[in-house]
Curated annotation (Swiss-Prot):
N-terminal Ras-GEF domain residues: 65-196
Pfam families: RA, RasGEF, RasGEF_N
SUPFAM superfamilies linked: Ras GEF (SSF48366), Ubiquitin-like (SSF54236)
Residues annotated as domain Ras-associating: 648-735
GO MF assignments: guanyl-nucleotide exchange factor activity
Subunit text: Interacts with Ras.
Name of the featured protein: Ral guanine nucleotide dissociation stimulator-like 1
Biased composition regions of type Low complexity, renumbered to the chain: 541-561, 586-596
Function noted in UniProt: Probable guanine nucleotide exchange factor.
InterPro entries: RA_dom (IPR000159), Ras-like_GEF (IPR008937), Ras-like_Gua-exchang_fac_N (IPR000651), Ras_G-nucl-exch_fac_CS (IPR019804), Ras_GEF_dom_sf (IPR023578), RASGEF_cat_dom (IPR001895), RASGEF_cat_dom_sf (IPR036964), RGL1_RA (IPR030748)
Record region (Disordered): 530-623
Alphabetical GO biological process terms: small GTPase-mediated signal transduction
Species of provenance: Mus musculus (Mouse)
List of residues that carry Phosphoserine: 520
Amino acid sequence: MKLLWQAKMSSIQDWGEEVEEGAVYHVTLKRVQIQQAANKGARWLGVEGDQLPPGHTVSQYETCKIRTIKAGTLEKLVENLLTAFGDNDFTYISIFLSTYRGFASTKEVLELLLDRYGNLTGPNCEDDGSQSSPESKAVIRNAIASILRAWLDQCAEDFREPPHFPCLQKLLEYLKQMMPGSDPERRAQNLLEQFQKQDVDSDNGLLNTSSFSLEEEEELESGGSAEFTNFSEDLVAEQLTYMDAQLFKKVVPHHCLGCIWSQRDKKENKHLAPTIRATISQFNTLTKCVVSTVLGSKELKTQQRARVIEKWINIAHECRILKNFSSLRAIVSALQSNSIYRLKKAWAAVPKDRMLMFEELSDIFSDHNNHLTSRELLMKEGTSKFANLDSSVKENQKRTQRRLQLQKDMGVMQGTVPYLGTFLTDLTMLDTALQDYIEGGLINFEKRRREFEVIAQIKLLQSACNSYCMGPDQKFIQWFQRQQLLSEEESYALSCEIEAAADANTTSPKPRKSMVKRLSLLFLGSDIIPGSTPTKEQPKSAASGSSGESMDSVSVSSCESNHSEAEEGPVTPMDTPDEPQKKLSESSSSCSSIHSMDTNSSGMSSLINPLSSPPTCNNNPKIHKRSVSVTSITSTVLPPVYNQQNEDTCIIRISVEDNNGNMYKSIMLTSQDKTPAVIQRAMSKHNLESDPAEEYELVQVISEDKELVIPDSANVFYAMNSQVNFDFILRKKNSVEEQVKLRSRTSLTLPRTAKRGCWSNRHSKITL
């Protein structure tokens, strides 16, 4: 047994690095077992070892050299596409094609591949004796054919460049000349015809931007709670899953890369990543639909409103059975939003078993340990045929088992629709934490391998979605599309009309903990909204939901009626409706809601719980340019994460305390960083380079009533408090006295117009 263990341990050996001009390779040696026939006659006849009975074969081992490129110039990375298979780096082509947009364009890669390495008849090829032989040309031709076949199959969207499709035309011209009649040529020709047809249909208005658009001539009818109650819960969950699955399967995985997704706020990129935007829009529409149906009209009785809440809880449970984590999270987020959760009388009328079910569903998205629960569920059930549900409530357990048994009896297999924000968060954090280039200006390809691990999960789940056997129910989809969605102001105002705030003029409202964040904000990657940490109690928010059409704004709560740049999901601060529900509020207060981008440990928790400002605020913070991290990180060192100091690095979040200061920026901090350097980098992230750095101070938020002012001469890594959230404020030094006065005026009450995230209720300060 000991010898066997030693053999396994030594089967792969790290051999070190090989450095060539323009490239660095990592080399490992792997022992590979080979089955051979025991007698010479069988070996001479070419009989394979696995075709012989036991006892007629012998096992032999050979050492296989695996060489994987760690970093290189663009030319070397493209050249490695041709040689990777010979180096036993079998995943390189897929990794490169999925991530190369982070350092090159399709045109650059195609020109290098075809003009430099694919020109088998040019003078360069004739001068190179090693490539001029027919055998060498055949090897290169086969390698290029395999690369192009994979490119056209896996990443066809790279060639969508209407109206002329220059890269696809160049590729097709090359294939007609070098590989006439080949499979890649047929694929390229079919793809060009498909793109051209779609382009014509789009110009003629025949191509809908949404898969679920209604015909214009259909008479619109206003939906409401009365009509909503006519749909069965399993039908609603199934239709939501159908819509989510269709949208998720259309997501272009490489658009989730942090280097691409973080650029969507630029004006020239307003149409960037439309498939991701469509998924976000569906999420936000569902949250607003939940809010609208629960609030309904003022005439609804408390019991009727409670039944609508109960129905949505049951629908969320059905989504859990269908493994639709996107709609599940949207429904939970909406029910936890301020406009709904403040309805104490309605929640008090919800049956206890449904409240316990709601608590269990909320716990799925707890941000404890970097959302470990939801991640484990996704890993466990991502490609499984059925959900695996355990409930502490006996009635819920019985109901769930009946539903699952019915699915098994009918032979129905379920796919999985993930919460995309988790992946978006992970990829954004990877992009922030890992450098794009290493010493010598070489492209850091180890970073791309890490990114591909996340991309591969997305692709795997997209394939799993094909297991769903569902069709559209036009009646429900039409009702869903026709919903009169309420803005934040409207939903909160209606909520207050339904149930007036208790003693709002005499006592300050009880602070609540943030539970979830709106989807579009979670997708903002490193641009994070303050108040997102579950351990901090925040002042009261006024509303949830909005009516935006795009998601280019990061304002926590857009307060204007014309949300031209705000596509926002639910805001979810919680207030315990009554004492029986206090346990629910506390146990699920760490819940959050968004897809994804999930790195290590608690690294992504920073992106999960931004809060919303009251709707009376008139300032929408702007998204600033992404700042690429160039701090040195090697593949042998744990990447820095938020709220955790790994060796000598960590990630902190810094906001600017001013009228627009409700946006966090992630910054990687090392043990060598002094306060002035950190302030300078934070100012650069927030586009404040024109201001003198000496006018600002760095303040760590300890709690709602305590701050830690970092001295100008301090080493921030060691001066900060590592036992609390790594949240900092960049504050002008001459504004401290004014803010102290402001605190004294607002400490007794929290008016509805108080801006969330401005820390105006902080009472004390700690200085070193």
